[in-house]
Amino acid sequence: MTVRTRFAPSPTGYLHVGGARTALFSWAYARHFGGTFVLRIEDTDLERSTPEAVQAIIEGMEWLGLHHDEGPFYQMQRMDRYREVIGQMLAAGTAYHCYSSPEEVEAMRERQRAAGEKPRYDGTWRPEAGKTLPAIPEGRKPVVRFRNPTEGDVTWLDVVKGSITISNRELDDLVIARPDGTPTYNFCVAVDDSDMKITHVIRGDDHVNNTPRQINILQALGATLPHYGHLPMILGTDGEKLSKRHGAVSVMDYPAQGYLPEAMLNYLARLGWSHGDDEVFSMEQFTQWFDLDHLTKSPAQFNPEKLDWLNNHYIKQADNTRLAGLVRPMMEGLGAQFENAPDLAAVIALMKERVNTLNELAVAAMLFYRQPAADAALLAQHLTDAIRPALAQYVEQLKTVAWSKEALSATLKEVLAAHKLKMPQLAMPLRLLITGQLQTPSIDAVVELFGREVVLARLGKNL
């Protein structure tokens, strides 16, 4: 059997975190077995589906690197196929025309509720042997209903939840085509899964109630049933369902907030799946390890601090030139002055250890790309008359010293020893004069990156 999985979002909004996790698990399972990952856009909800949402979903998948092998397939482009199958089902007797009006169906359900029964279609127009159907109302267009079995159960072994059984008595004769002929959600999904030969359906557990309906339709079509796995929801840190109030829930919010895709993928992989105590792993490792046996049944909790920790790890591991390309546009928005400034990749190498996001990295790197504006009171506090002779000697020696971190460090120590000063006594005024800030990386590294010309110019103004 060739494994074929699918990710089938409805384009009614952004690609959210839960959807991205579903896509990741479906993608990884196909990759693990050398199978095929299909992208299908379920866009039959014409009132809510938008081209912008389709684009947002595709952009989110591309940012994460979850590349599909087939598709994207759009349900709205498959209407002829759905109508063909509906015609076949009507001819086979597995579907029928129903002329009950919406008002009649609602009245029927109200009577059932009043009697303490589960609301369901009562089968008025369902053909049965020896049954006389009502006269067709003049001018009324019918819906098409699926002839659901009235006896027995629907049972499947869910790869996450275990065995699930639903009585057919709990299921309705589902409307599979509206009066205008447009097919409905569960019918389209079943036909698509059959036509696309999907072997494994991995999706959120909000679809559990759809599964028995889709199974019955697939069986009526004589199709091979896929394996189903329903992932538990993702919760916020307060134990409630993840929502906007917990912060970013759209995947494309995360690059805007300075997260790397590899950090997001690593984090999503651990939301409901585990491989021993492994916390950090590449996507190559993940696809080698991933299986459905280690998916958890209980809801996963989204922890922003854990995501930050992973992002810090991947920022530290990332190529500095790549990071420079990502943070430069952010810094331009902050007013960075790149002319006659240090190499950005070199600055990032120095600054990236201390940050959790690219946004933080951009802010930190601005130290090297703006004019210093030290607070006058701080300057008066740290640049005292007792320090000025040492500063003057340091400036003089900077004019000829070899420009390396090691040589600069030796020069600074030599000046400190000559004037019997401790490191902070000279390093603090140097930081203020060169950067305008008291908190910087090692003063030797800062001096080296700024370069001889800039450092001498900024220090010379205060001699």
UniProtKB/Swiss-Prot annotation:
The keyword Transcription does not apply. Keywords: Aminoacyl-tRNA synthetase, ATP-binding, Cytoplasm, Ligase, Nucleotide-binding, Protein biosynthesis. Residues 115-136 are annotated as: Disordered. Its EC number is 6.1.1.17. One of its GO terms (molecular function) is zinc ion binding. Its main location: cytoplasm. GO terms for biological process: glutamyl-tRNA aminoacylation. A motif ('HIGH' region) lies at residues 9-19. HAMAP family: Glu_tRNA_synth_type1. PANTHER family: GLUTAMATE--TRNA LIGASE, GLUTAMATE--TRNA LIGASE, MITOCHONDRIAL-RELATED. This is Glutamate--tRNA ligase. It comes from Janthinobacterium sp. (strain Marseille). The lineage of its organism: Bacteria, Pseudomonadati, Pseudomonadota, Betaproteobacteria, Burkholderiales. The gene is gltX.
